[in-house]
Each structure stands twice: as C-alpha cells, then as structure tokens.
Amino acid sequence: LQVFINTVLGECWEETSVEVDKFDDEQLAHRAEHYKADLPEGVLLLTAAVDVQEDRFEVEVRGWTRNYESWGIYKTEIYGNLIKDEPWDELEEYLRTTFRFEDGRELNIAGFGMDTGGHYTNKTYKWLKLQKKRGKKAYALKGFSRPGEDVQLLHKRSVVDIKDEIKGKMVVVDKTVLYIIG
C-alpha cells in the first residue's frame, strides 16, 4: 500500500499506527544522551560504514559493547570530486581518527565496510584493496537487491573483478571479495 500511495498516487505515506510516536525537534533533542567525551563507557570496539555518493562519502562510526549493543558515535560527510584522489585521501585520514573516553583512554576504528553498489564501484574496489595492503580491515559491501527473495543479514560472499583501462579497453587487473548484506 505504501509503495502504491508513494509511486502511483504521488502522495506522501503517513504512518497511522497508534504505535508510532511523533516527536517534534525539541522533544527529540531532549531525549538525546550527552557524553563528556567522544565515547561512552562500555564501548569496546569501533567500526565505520562508508556510503559512496556522487559528490561525497557519508561516514558513520559506531561503538560496540560486549553484548553487541551499539552507539552511533559520529557521522560526517567528506565532499569532493571522487574522480580525484583528494577526497579518498581525506577519507583515509578520517578513518585513522582517534576517539577518547572521558578518562583519556583512546580507541581507533578497528575496521570498516564500504558500499560498492552505486557510484565509483571500480575505484572503490581498488581503494579498498590498497587499504587491505596497508593492513586495514576493509570490506567491500553491497546491499542485497533481489526482489522476492528472503533478506538475510549476511549473504554468501563473492569474488569480483577490479578493472583498469589499458590501451582504451577495460581489463581485469585484480580481484577482491564482495560481501552482500541484507
């Protein structure tokens, strides 16, 4: 029904369930938890997810506890012409950020996944391969997109080609592992 209303009628879907709470900006701001440091106590591991857009990277850092509870630690956007190396270098630098607890202890991002299913796919594969060679835990990710099939959190991984243009032709120069996620 929601798809029909949005796409066929061109109207905005409005959730009518009594379970849906509606908050204004002030109410949401009041509910936010504030910490005196980058990291709340209990975070043991940091991961990052990178979404590649046409003109930017959207990065979210999450902190994880022993029981898989997670906190959104920080979100940022890195703008630039992704055909050039500068935004990729800026992303690499950001992923080396040190985050701190209130008592001064520090934690770095342990690993990151990067969406490869949209813009700059081949460049993303190459960049991730370089990060792995530099010792980073870097994972190529793609969202599951087969209508009608059950969505699982993690699907079978696959091996994909990394290509380069050589003498005007796209040629396979390497391979990398791609993780399909739900």
Region roles according to the model:
Residues 118-182:
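Metal-dependent DNA phosphodiester-chemistry modules and their immediately adjacent helices/loops
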Residues 13-18, 52-94:
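Metal-dependent catalytic core segments for phosphate chemistry
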Residues 39-43, 52-54, 84-88, 105-106, ...:
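Active-site-proximal structural scaffolding
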Residues 44-47, 56-60, 69-71, 106-113, ...:
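Beta-sheet entry/capping signal
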Residues 80-111, 127-130:
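Short, basic/hydrophobic alpha-helical segments
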Residues 30-34, 44-47, 96-100, 121-127:
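Short alpha-helical segments and helix-capping/turn motifs at coil-helix boundaries
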Residues 1-47, 60:
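A contiguous, basic/glycine-rich beta-loop/short-helix subdomain that forms a polymer-engagement track
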Residues 52-55, 62-64, 112-119, 141-146:
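An acidic- and aromatic-residue-enriched active-site/binding cleft used to recognize and process polar
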